[in-house]
Amino acid sequence: MAGLRARRGPGRRLLVLSTLGFCLMLQVSAKRPPKTPPCPPSCSCTRDTAFCVDSKSVPKNLPSEVISLTLVNAAFSEIQDGAFSHLPLLQFLLLNSNKFTLIGDNAFIGLSHLQYLFIENNDIWALSKFTFRGLKSLTHLSLANNNLQTLPRDIFRPLDILSDLDLRGNALNCDCKVKWLVEWLAHTNTTVAPIYCASPPRFQEHKVQDLPLREFDCITTDFVLYQTLSFPAVSAEPFLYSSDLYLALAQPGASACTILKWDYVERQLRDYDRIPAPSAVHCKPMVVDGQLYVVVAQLFGGSYIYHWDPNTTRFTKLQDIDPQRVRKPNDLEAFRIDGDWFFAVADSSKAGATSLYRWHQNGFYSHQALHAWHRDTDLEFVDGEGKPRLIVSSSSQAPVIYQWSRSQKQFVAQGEVTQVPDAQAVKHFRAGRDSYLCLSRYIGDSKILRWEGTRFSEVQALPSRGSLALQPFLVGGHRYLALGSDFSFTQIYQWDEGRQKFVRFQELAVQAPRAFCYMPAGDAQLLLAPSFKGQTLVYRHVVVDLSA
């Protein structure tokens, strides 16, 4: 028994000592001061402040009561979304002398109490317009001494009560992207320290606050692909009939003249009807006395005139065009002189003659043979100064100008455009008081000529090897020239009013265009490009504000 008690003695003492020690610990802990708040190794912390150096990320193990955080010389470059959301009471945030290059859209989300934000001496060159989203209490913001070249529009909109802003020390590029800032500085109640432009040269060292808004030319235009018609075509002619907008396309590959209708709801061109035409080169719609006619010019099998019957809602053949007179049509032009309707056909055959037809009561009748044996390629009707003229281009001689004689009721040869020995297409336009001709050439440069009162003079040559089509057109106050080629992409030129010349504006990926057609469709301004080898493309003209 004594031995048994001897063996249990040490164990019982250990148990007693352990119990006593635990009680003492409880007593001591009851008298110990509050526990030091958690703090990452790279930081110095108090209950409500943290100062961090060389941190590898935004510290997470910080007191939740922290209201002031400083990050210096951080070893990371990106501040990610929600990086400070674990510090909802933060009022002061200083991110100075770091290597930050990117700040996420919602980096400061959840900091509804933040009043002071300093992001200085970093490598930030761009910010998102949503960078400061959620900072509804921010009063002081500094972005000084970064690499900011621009600022997105409305970046400061979420900062309702911002009173002080510092943007000094940034290499601001004072182009259209900064125009909004100039406007904002003129109307804001925020105090902003003077900031200066680093570029462009004309604004270098100019104070941003003093830049005149009129110096910013920020409105430009663009042609964007709007609709693709999955078939080749060689001509396109828009027309209005019964208050609806249509488009007639010559499709020799499909053996048809295809009629499309503009859908004002879907804002697209839709299939409407077809006229059989095995070798169509041009489908010319004409609305005469409220009746719709389509002149179908074909290389083979004769050319015809069709009439739209609204009762049967179909096209019916109205008459033939004399195949002995029109052998190989290449272009059609319709026009009106002194109340009479005419159409002219350019004949490109060696034995053909360009011919003029006139509407009389119930059909079109031959009126005049203009130009025989010259392989004509294109026609352009010009009605200026009360003197109707018809210009005929040819692959074998210089373009010929005909003027309408009211006494003879015929076109009379007036002269030649001697500056161009041959031309595939001829178009005209007016700019101010001046009249111009545009002539495309398959071999050699296309020409822009200006009428000088007694003759044409060349004002510009445009490289255009392989060109069979060109078209000047006006959209609002913007004048353009579309110049196609069989060997390269289509070039869009824009008229420079100051230089009185076309300057290269845009390139369109159109293969072997055979025509260009401008078609306003409601508020959509469309450019159609029928292609001989590929799809027919529809581009939309849009206005772009570079300051947006």
Curated annotation (Swiss-Prot):
The UniProt record lists the keyword Ligase: no
LRRCT domain mapped to chain residues: 170-220
InterPro entries: Cys-rich_flank_reg_C (IPR000483), EAR (IPR009039), EPTP (IPR005492), Leu-rich_rpt (IPR001611), Leu-rich_rpt_typical-subtyp (IPR003591), LGI_related (IPR051295), LRR_dom_sf (IPR032675), Quinoprot_gluc/sorb_DH_b-prop (IPR011041)
GO biological process, one term: exocytosis
Predominant localisation class: secreted
Pfam families assigned to the protein according to its UniProt record, in alphabetical order: EPTP, LRR_8
Signal peptide: 1-30
Record-linked SUPFAM superfamilies: L domain-like, Soluble quinoprotein glucose dehydrogenase
Residues linked to a glycan: 189, 311
LRR repeats: 89-110, 113-134, 137-158
Residue windows of the EAR repeats: 222-264, 268-310, 314-361, 363-406, 410-453, 455-497, 501-543
Subunit note: Interacts with STX1A.
Protein name: Leucine-rich repeat LGI family member 3
Source organism: Mus musculus
